[in-house]
Amino acid sequence: MLVFDKSVTLFDKLKEYDKESLKLYGSDLGLTKLSKFRKDELVQKVVDKLLDLDVMFYRGAILSDKQIAVLERGFNGPTSYSEDESDDIGTLNEMDFIIVSRDEYVVPCDVVKAWKKTKDEQFLAYQKRASWVWKCLYWTEEMYACTPIDIMLQVVNIKKDMQFDQAEVIEIFNHFPEDH
């Protein structure tokens, strides 16, 4: 049974996954030769990858400002959330940034530590742009399913204070987490 307090770790959460799910997750994260590991070793490999500061940087960069605020509110232990935050809680839970119970969530202590090391001025500048491209990509997928780059550029450049060229959009896109 998972202990639900601020001492909970990402390992504790991922240990609840079955081995096949962990192998698929690890593969999505770029890990290889996962079949040879026992479950605890596999959990640790995935945890190490998720807590890697570069991985944390790019995974966190797709989060909206609201999602980041919700995440950080859970740093000090179990925190309640509103119905309006349910979608954000779902996203953060799917990305394994948080652990959710019926009406509360908590951020694993090792995620808090890695997040605090990751969130700096460089991250915030990149996150502002990457989260916008992510939001636009999500919208274009819903509207068109497949979007040519010239149309995608028109969509992302709709904000007057934030302009992108094709190379930057592709660079940002190439860093989006494959598991999400």
Regions found by a protein language model. Give the residues of each.
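DNA-recognition alpha helix
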Residues: 26-27, 151-160
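Basic helix-extension-helix modules of the SAP/HeH family
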Residues: 1-115
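Short, charged/polar micro-motifs that form catalytic or ligand-binding hotspots
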Residues: 12, 32, 61, 79-82, ...
